[in-house]
Amino acid sequence: MAALQEKKSCSQRMAEFRQYCWNPDTGQMLGRTPARWVWISLYYAAFYVVMTGLFALCIYVLMQTIDPYTPDYQDQLKSPGVTLRPDVYGERGLQISYNISENSSWAGLTHTLHSFLAGYTPASQQDSINCSSEKYFFQETFSAPNHTKFSCKFTADMLQNCSGLVDPSFGFEEGKPCFIIKMNRIVKFLPSNNTAPRVDCTFQDDPQKPRKDIEPLQVQYYPPNGTFSLHYFPYYGKKAQPHYSNPLVAAKFLNVPKNTQVLIVCKIMADHVTFDNPHDPYEGKVEFKLTIQK
C-alpha cells in the first residue's frame, strides 16, 4: 500500500504561490506570459467596444421611432380626471370638515390653496402669453423660443374673490368656502365642439343619509360662468409646452348648511367629457363631503 503523501508546510505553499504569481524560469505571471496577457486584454477591450457600439446603435434606432412630443402610452380614459383643492382624503374619498370659530381647523386648508396658487403668480407665468380668443389654440409649428409651443397665461387674479388676494381666508372664515377645480391634462384633447367646458356643482343625496329638506346649492364661479376657456386647449405635452399651466375654476359655496355633512359633486359639462364611469369616480367629476361647524 502506497504511503500517504506528506502534507506540505506553510512555507512550501507560500513558495508555490509566489512562483505562480511570477515564474522567473518561464517568464509567466499568473500562469501566462506578458504577451499573452496583452493579447487577452486587447481581445476583451475590442469585444466590449463592439458590444457597447451595438447597444448604442439599438438605442439610437429605437429613439428614432419615438416621437418626443407625443407619449406612446396614454390612459384608456376618454375623459380627463378632475381634482379638487384643498384636498383632504378620509376613509371614503374626499372629506373636508372645519369649524368657523376655530381658525386652526381651516388654516391648513387655506395654506394648501395659497401653496397651490403660488404657481399662478404673474412672475411664474412670465414665459406664457396673453390669450383672449376664446377659441381652440391650434399650433402646427414650434414658434415659441427653444423650439416649443406657446402657452396661455392663467394667473390667480382671474379667480377674483377666490384668488386669495382679496380674501386670504378664501371664504372659510365666513362659512362660504372657495374650492378650486382642475381638469387633468390629456395630450391633444378637445373637450367640446367649440363650446367652453364649464363646472356645475350641486348637492347630491348621500345614499346612506338621504335628505329632502335641503335647498339647491348656490354657487359663485370664477372665472364667470365657471368655464375653462378654449384657448387653453389642446395641450401638446410637457416637452412641447414646458410652461403650460392648467386653467382653473373656483367655486364659492354660499349656502352650505352648518353642523351637518353634505355631499357635493362638481361635474365638467362638455360634449366630450363623461362623468358616469362606475369604475373611476373622478373621471369628469369630483365628489366630496363637506362639513362646516359653527
Swiss-Prot record:
Residues of this chain annotated as glycosylated in UniProt: 99, 103, 130, 146, 161, 193, 225
Keyword annotations from UniProtKB, A to Z: Cell adhesion, Cell membrane, Disulfide bond, Glycoprotein, Hydrogen ion transport, Ion transport, Membrane, Potassium, Potassium transport, Signal-anchor, Transmembrane, Transmembrane helix, Transport
Annotated segments matching region immunoglobulin-like: 194-294
Tissue specificity as recorded in UniProt: Stomach.
Bilayer-spanning residue ranges: 37-57
Membrane topology according to the record: Single-pass type II membrane protein
Subcellular location: Apical cell membrane; Cell membrane
MF term (GO), any: ATPase activator activity
Ranges in the topological domain labelled Cytoplasmic: 1-36
Record keyword Glycoprotein present: yes
Extracellular topological domain residue ranges: 58-294
Disulfide bridges in this chain: 131-152, 162-178, 201-266
Family: Belongs to the X(+)/potassium ATPases subunit beta family.
Domain notes: The C-terminal lobe folds into an immunoglobulin-like domain and mediates cell adhesion properties.
Assembly mode: The ATPase pump is composed of two subunits: alpha (catalytic) and beta (regulatory). Interacts with alpha subunit ATP12A; this interaction is required for the formation of a functionally active pump and targeting at the plasma membrane. Interacts (via N-terminus) with alpha subunit ATP4A (via the P-domain).
Protein's recorded name: Potassium-transporting ATPase subunit beta
Species whose genome carries this gene: Rattus norvegicus
